[in-house]
UniProtKB/Swiss-Prot annotation:
Belongs to the universal ribosomal protein uL3 family. GO terms for molecular function: rRNA binding; structural constituent of ribosome. Keywords: Methylation, Ribonucleoprotein, Ribosomal protein, RNA-binding, rRNA-binding. It comes from the Bacteria. The gene is rplC. The modification N5-methylglutamine is found at residue 153. Pfam families: Ribosomal_L3. One of its GO terms (cellular component) is cytosolic large ribosomal subunit. Signal peptide: none annotated. Part of the 50S ribosomal subunit. Forms a cluster with proteins L14 and L19. This is Large ribosomal subunit protein uL3. Transmembrane segments: none annotated.
Length: 212
């Protein structure tokens, strides 16, 4: 239970350490995270901070949400995210505040959640990392076939959950234990070592690592 930030994946690049080592990093834009609601144990039963990120046209905002945002005095965003925190941290926030990138520090471990890139309909080899069958030596028809998917007349069906061909990607995915290489407070950017889920321009959620 700790405060995080919602951001946008800008893309990947590399930076160089003092010893000349090349470090692949993902650039995350976490600017303009604004507090829309502070939830307290007395009123809501738990302690949390709700933040908005991004922009949304007023014509695309429902009346209940517009009233909720007007009460906080913030503009609408296309993402509304809640972070549960400790009750003693609530005093540091109020509706309308900006949550800055400085809540993170260089060298800190974080978990980044995003939506993986959709790959469409894929076979079992690519989707589940199955091994291909023999290329020759008597095999002429089933090089990338998945093999048997069932048994005999008993049970007479394919069990639910059987790993087969199907849609791959476009699901929520989390990369755990990534290291923050640089915090750019002026441009509200995080540079995280390695890759994070999603395409360029997709939304991500950055939290302190649960296994740090």
């Amino acid at each position: 239970m700790s405060l995080g930030l919602v951001g946008r994946k800008v893309g990947m690049t590399r930076i160089f350490a003092e010893d000349g080592a090349s470090i692949p990093v993902t650039v995350l834009d976490v600017s303009n995270n604004r507090v829309t609601q502070v939830k307290t144990p007395e009123i809501d039963g738990y302690a949390a901070i709700q933040v908005a990120f991004g922009k949304r046209r007023a014509s695309r905002v429902s009346k209940p949400l517009a009233g909720h945002l007007a009460k906080a005095g913030v503009e609408a965003g296309h993402v509304l995210k809640e972070f549960q925190i400790e009750a003693d941290q609530l005093a540091s926030f109020k509706a309308g505040d900006q949550v800055a990138v400085t809540i993170f520090a260089e060298g800190q471990k974080v978990d980044v959640t995003g939506t993986s890139i959709g790959k469409g309909f894929q076979g079992g080899i690519k989707r589940h990392n199955f091994s291909s069958n023999r290329a020759s030596h008597g095999n002429s028809l089933s090089h990338n076939a998945p093999g048997s998917i069932g048994m005999a007349q008993d049970p007479g069906r394919v069990f639910p959950g059987k790993r087969m061909a199907g849609h791959l990607g476009d699901v929520q995915s989390t990369m755990q234990g990534l290291t923050i290489v640089r915090v750019d407070a002026d441009r509200q950017l995080l540079l995280v070592k390695g890759a994070v889920p999603g395409a360029k321009g997709s939304d991500v959620v950055v939290r302190p690592a649960v296994k740090a």
